[in-house]
Amino acid sequence: MGKEYLKPTVFISGHRDLTQEEFDLYYGMQLDWLIIQEEIEFVIGDYDGCDTMAQEYLTEQGFDPSRVTIYHMGDKPMNLVNKRFKTIGGFKNDIERDSAMTNASTYDVAYIRKGKENSGTAQNILRRFTF
C-alpha cells in the first residue's frame, strides 16, 4: 500500500543562528515562488533562527495562515509569530518532531552551511531519502 496523497507541503528548516542575510539569500526567492502556488502548505518548527524567520516571512507576505502548521515539543510553541497558524505539539525531542514534519511534507526548503553537514537541518534532508 502506498503513501496516501499529501497536498504539496514544504518543510522549511535551517540553522538556529541563521542571519537575516542568509535567510534572504537562501530562502527568500524559493518562498516567493512557492507562496504563489495554489495548494501549497508549509510545516515549520518553533525555534529561533530559520523557523522564526520563516514564520515572520510568510506572515509579512500575507500567506494564508491556515496553510501553515508549526510543530513543537511540549505543550506550546516557543515561537509562534501568527496565532492563526495551526500547531501540532507534544513531541519528546527534536528527532521525533522533525521526523513528523518530514512525514507530513513532500518537499524541503533548507540551507546547510559548509562544515555543518551533520546538523539537524542536514539530517532533515537525509531523512526524506531513507523512507
Region locations from a protein language model:
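Acidic/glycine-enriched connector segments
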Residues: 2-8, 16-131
